[in-house]
């Protein structure tokens, strides 16, 4: 009997050892001391986020988004892979964080004392506020006391705590917390007139306005608050230290500024009339030309090429300017000859030539400029000429900036129109402020196309899922009757 007992103990020990070799993190992940070690052991960082046009989304180019790129850089700094896990709302994120199913939550989450008590928080990297959104052309409430209809919020208990505090000042204040729809889906319902008000993150509202100009902001519900990543309450200090060092480095190297420029820089500019006209053109005009943009995109994103064409001509193949540039890409005679096309008003010829010219401009730029940023420099050259771009880079260097960094060069473009600067430059005066706005508009137009199609695809997926669910319910009802 004793021998049998020893054999059982030995067998169990070997079994646990084998499991530990294959799945060591299953034992490590739940302890404070070993959270960091668990990440290293499994070779992957699990990051929870929310699928929207700022934090995280996927398209034909793969995974994208502010939080994705920042999390990818953090995972790289740890020497592990990144695995993004998407959820519908903040409470789902936090539940998974509580269960240690994710290592951190990253979704532009605003600071709230309730969350800080429940979790560890990383360094602040941005700020935002809660705002009341309503539908344009409806009555705009001046404060919460004027709100007479339902207010909708996504599943966010911290926001609900804020509203409970405000309810002391506005006793009639009521709201509906939707536990199934995302904040973005609530804003879409608001834009379509299905619900009267939504309280949402100011970043998400500004982003949605770029494709749903019907959305308007009534007022801020709260002051601006810091945005943080959140970690499980019991996270070993090695992970917290690694995150702190990473965020400090991201600030110093310009990574954070570059990501803010890429994903947030364009959303602060909003013009209702321009955006409404543009969305109408995306729906009704772009489908005529998108096959040509895709055909001649080359190394570019076809949606960027389309955005350039809209900025140039509003997708009018017969557009003509007082200076003589013509066609959907608004080419000069010299450029048309250089690109060997005969008819600038022919959409296919114009798009082909415009794309080839942009590729040529990119090829003229030094290798010291990062590949992803070259297009913005090339667009300046497309607008005001390569010589003036060279001047802008030289001026940036003279002023102590980095001539290879788009953010540094961008802020100095308006100086090309000031005599004290252009008088010292080789190519002289240029309307650099127009080039600055030119690139900003194109970035905004491109992102709007990307997100318009993303929202359309999501709605199709949701509609199909609803239809499948309805069919399943009908089948179950039929079976029950039978």
From Swiss-Prot:
Active site: residue positions: 312
Please give, as recorded in its UniProt entry, the membrane topology of this protein. Answer: Peripheral membrane protein
Kindly list the places in or outside the cell where this protein is found, as annotated in its UniProt entry: Cell outer membrane
Q: Where is this region: Non-LT domain?
A: 14-267
Q: Name one GO molecular function term.
A: peptidoglycan lytic transglycosylase activity
What is the protein's known function?
Answer: Murein-degrading enzyme that degrades murein glycan strands and insoluble, high-molecular weight murein sacculi, with the concomitant formation of a 1,6-anhydromuramoyl product. Lytic transglycosylases (LTs) play an integral role in the metabolism of the peptidoglycan (PG) sacculus. Their lytic action creates space within the PG sacculus to allow for its expansion as well as for the insertion of various structures such as secretion systems and flagella.
Q: What is known of its domains?
A: The N-terminal domain does not have lytic activity and probably modulates enzymatic activity. The C-terminal domain is the catalytic active domain.
Family, similarity comment: In the N-terminal section; belongs to the bacterial solute-binding protein 3 family. In the C-terminal section; belongs to the transglycosylase Slt family.
* UniProt protein name: Membrane-bound lytic murein transglycosylase F
Organism this protein belongs to: Haemophilus influenzae (strain PittEE)
Name of the gene: mltF
């Amino acid at each position: 009997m004793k021998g049998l007992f020893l054999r059982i103990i030995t067998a169990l020990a070997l079994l646990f050892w084998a499991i530990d070799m294959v799945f060591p993190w299953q034992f490590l992940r739940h302890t404070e001391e070993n959270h960091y070690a668990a990440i290293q052991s499994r070779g992957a960082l699990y990051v929870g986020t929310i699928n929207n046009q700022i934090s995280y989304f996927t398209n034909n180019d793969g995974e994208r988004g502010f939080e994705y790129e920042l999390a990818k850089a953090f995972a790289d700094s740890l020497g592990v892979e990144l695995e993004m896990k998407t959820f519908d709302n903040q409470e789902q994120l936090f539940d998974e964080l509580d269960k240690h199913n994710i290592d951190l939550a990253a979704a532009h989450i605003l600071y709230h004392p309730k969350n800080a008590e429940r979790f560890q928080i990383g360094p602040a990297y941005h700020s935002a506020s809660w705002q009341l959104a309503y539908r344009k052309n409806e009555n705009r409430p001046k404060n919460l006391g004027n709100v007479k209809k339902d207010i909708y919020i996504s599943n966010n208990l911290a926001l609900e705590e804020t509203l409970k505090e405000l309810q002391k000042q506005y006793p009639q204040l009521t709201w509906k917390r939707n536990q199934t729809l995302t904040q973005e889906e609530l804003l879409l319902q608001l834009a379509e007139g299905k619900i009267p008000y939504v309280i949402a993150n100011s970043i998400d509202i500004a982003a949605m306005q770029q494709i749903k100009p019907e959305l308007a902001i009534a007022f801020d519900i709260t002051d601006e608050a810091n945005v943080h990543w959140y970690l499980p309450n019991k996270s070993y200090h090695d992970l917290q230290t690694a995150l702190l060092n990473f965020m400090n480095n991201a600030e110093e190297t310009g990574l954070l500024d570059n990501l803010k420029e890429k994903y947030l820089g364009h959303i602060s500019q909003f013009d209702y009339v321009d955006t409404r006209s543009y969305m109408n053109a995306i729906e009704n005009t772009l489908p005529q030309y998108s096959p040509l943009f895709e055909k001649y995109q080359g190394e570019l994103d076809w949606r960027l090429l389309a955005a350039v064409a809209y900025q140039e001509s509003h997708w009018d193949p017969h557009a003509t300017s007082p200076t003589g540039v013509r066609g959907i890409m608004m080419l000069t005679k010299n450029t048309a000859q250089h690109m060997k096309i005969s008819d600038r008003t022919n959409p296919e010829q114009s798009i082909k030539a415009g794309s080839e010219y942009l590729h040529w401009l990119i090829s003229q730029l030094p290798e010291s400029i990062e590949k992803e940023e070259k297009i913005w420099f090339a667009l300046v050259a497309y607008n005001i000429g390569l010589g003036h771009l060279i001047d802008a880079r030289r001026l940036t260097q003279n002023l102590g900036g980095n001539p290879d960094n788009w953010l540094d060069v961008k802020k100095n473009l308006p100086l090309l129109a000031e005599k004290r600067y252009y008088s010292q430059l080789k190519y002289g005066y240029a309307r650099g402020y127009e080039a600055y706005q030119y690139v900003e508009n194109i970035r905004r137009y491109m992102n709007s196309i990307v997100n318009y199609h993303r929202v359309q695809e999501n709605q199709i997926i949701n509609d199909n899922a609803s239809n499948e669910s309805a069919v399943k319910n009908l089948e179950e009802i039929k079976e029950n009757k039978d």
